C-alpha cells in the first residue's frame, strides 16, 4: 500500500465516522482499517479504556493529504506478548528479578525477566538469515508489532514499536520510532531504515523475556498518571548499574483472563513504600481489582516473605445464601385481604406514626366513589388488622372530632354511627378493598380540582378534598346542593386529619370566578404549507428553519464542505427569486446537529401555539379562530417548488388571490384591535412602536390613517415577503406574551438575516421597520 492508497482509505474511513457521529469499536474494523486508524493519530483518536476510535473534528480536503503519525502503543496491541506471558512456566507465588521497561494504558507494565535467558540459537539464526530481511514500507509500521533491528556490523535484535519519535514531516526512511528490545534490557529510538521484517523469528516460535504485568490491586490507572509513571521508570532505567542489577518483584499469580502477571515491587523513587501503595497514595488508580489478594507491606517485600494471601470483600457466587429461618415469637393475626402491602415492622403499634402514615397513604390512593359510607375505622381495618376495641376507640374519637369541626346534626351523627356498628364491621372491611387506580390518575384529578371554578366556590368540600383527597372531582361535575352530600363529604375526614380542625378555623376564600358555558373551539384546518416550510425535526413550526440558518451563519459551520465537497457556485444576489429560494428551500438536514434539543422544542412549541379570540368568545360566538402563526404555514412565495424525498420536481405551489375569499382559509387575525402593520398603544408593553414623535402623534390621533399610508407606501413590494414579515412579527409578539426569550431572540435574528438578503430597497425598509417594532417588545422581559 503506497501513500496515496493509504490516504484514500483514511479519508474514506474518516468520512464514514463523521457521518456516523458515534465512536467505532476496534473489533468492528477489518485488519486494514485497524492499521489505518493506528497510523493516523492526526485524524483518529483512540480510547484505550473503551477500545474504540473516534474522528477528530477537523476540516479535511481530499486534495490535501494529511501526514500520518503512529499512535502510542496500547494494551490492545500486545496480543503476541500476552500469549508469551501466558506460557511462562515459573512457580507462583514467588520472587523473580525484573526490570520495568514501560507503562501503558489501561494498565500494563512491560517488565523484563532477568532470570529468563534468550533462546540459544536465536542470534546465530538471525545472522544467517539477514540476507532475506527487507525494509518495511512506512505504511506497514504499526504500534505493538515486532520488527528486527539490524546494526551496521550485522548484529540483529528483535524489538516492538512503542511510539513514533521525532518530526513526521520528514522522508519515510528518516522517521524515528521508540522501540523496546524483547531479548535484552534496552529502549532506544531507531530510524525506519534500520528496521527489517521477516517471516521467521516470531515470538511464538522463539519465546522472549519481555512480559506483560500489572500491579496488584489495580486494574487501570488514570490517563494523566501514566506519563509520571513512565518518568519514574526512565529515571530507574537510566542508571546502568540499576538496569543490569534489576530488582526483586513478588509474583502473586497469573491472571488467565487478562494474560498478565500480577506483581508488586518496591517504589522506584526509593521511598519505603511498595508500588501499589505509592499509586494508591497518589490516587493514580482509576479501577481497583477487587479479586486480587491484599498486597504485601514494604517490610515483607524486603524480607522476601511469602505469606498466606488475604482477600477483602471476597464473595463467592457459588456460596450458600444465609436465610433467616428463625420463627418469630409474636403471633400475627390473619390480615384482611387488601391491595396495600403490609409490613410487620410497621404493625407494632396502630397508633404509631408509621401506621398512621401508611393508613393515610392508602386513603389517598382510594378512588372517591369507593369511600362513600366508610368511616375511618373501616378504612383503618382494611389496611391492617386491628382489634375491635381499638376500632371502637378510633370511632368514638372520630365522631367527637367531626361533631366539633363540622357542626353535623345529631340524626346524621347517629346514622353514621350505625354504619360502623360491630355487626356490620366485617362486611365493611370485606368491601372496602377496591382496586387502587394508578397514581397518575389521582394527580390529574387533583390538578383539575384545584384549577376548576367549582372547587374555588365550594370551599368546605375543597378543604375536605385537600386534606383527605377523597372529594376530587372533574371540572364539569355539578356542585353539591343538598345538605346530606355535604355531611357525607365531611364524614370522610379521617381521625388524625379531623382532629387538627376546630370550629374557629376560617376557610380561606378565593375571588369568585364566573361560570361560563362556552368551550374554546379547536381549529381543525389542515396545514397547507409546502414540505420545505415544515420543521425538519417533525414539528410544523417554520421558525426552526430560520433559527437553524441563523445559528449556522453565526458559527460559520459548513458541514457540506467538511470532506472537500464544494458547494455549487451561487447565482447573482440581485435575483429576488433565487435569493428567496436559497434562503428558504435549502435542505436543512445538514445543519440539524447544530440545534440544541431545548431550542428545537421551545421554538416549535411557541410558533404553533393556538390563541383563541377572546372578544369572539365573550360574545358567545363559536366560530373557530386561528393562531397568528397559522398564517406562516399558509404563506408561500410564488417561485417555490415542492420536491419529494428523492428530489424529484413536483407541482409548484402558488397563491391564488381568490383563496382569500374562502372563509375556511384564515390567514390573519380578524381582531380589529390588533393591527399587523403597526403595533398600537394597546400592545402588551404599553409602548408605541413608532420611531419619531411625529409618528407617535399620528398613532394617538388616528392609527388607521397612519396604517393606510404605510400600506400605500409599500404597495409595490412583494406580497410574499410582506406577509412573511408580518407573520414573523406576530411570532415575536407571541414569544413576548409567553415570556419565551429564546424564541423571541431567534425570530428577531431571523428577521435581520432576511432583511439583509432581500434585494430591493423598499423591501429592506419594510423589513427594518418591522424589526424596529419587534425590538421594542423586548421591554416585556424587563
From Swiss-Prot:
**Name the UniProt record assigns to this protein:** Hypersensitive to pore-forming toxin protein 40
Give yes or no: UniProt keyword Cytoplasm: yes
Primary localization class, coarse: cytoplasm
GO cellular component labels: mutator focus; perinuclear region of cytoplasm
- Domain of life of the source: Eukaryota
Q: Does the keyword Transport apply?
A: no
Organism, per UniProt?
Answer: Caenorhabditis elegans
Subcellular localization:
Cytoplasm, Perinuclear region
Q: In what ranges is there compositional bias, type Basic and acidic residues? A: 638-662
Q: What is known of its domains?
A: Tudor domain specifically binds peptides with symmetrically dimethylated arginines (sDMA) and may facilitate protein-protein interactions.
- Ranges where the record places region Disordered: 332-351, 413-448, 472-492, 617-672
Skewed-composition ranges (Polar residues) = 332-346, 413-443, 617-634
Q: Which residues form the Tudor domain?
A: 138-203
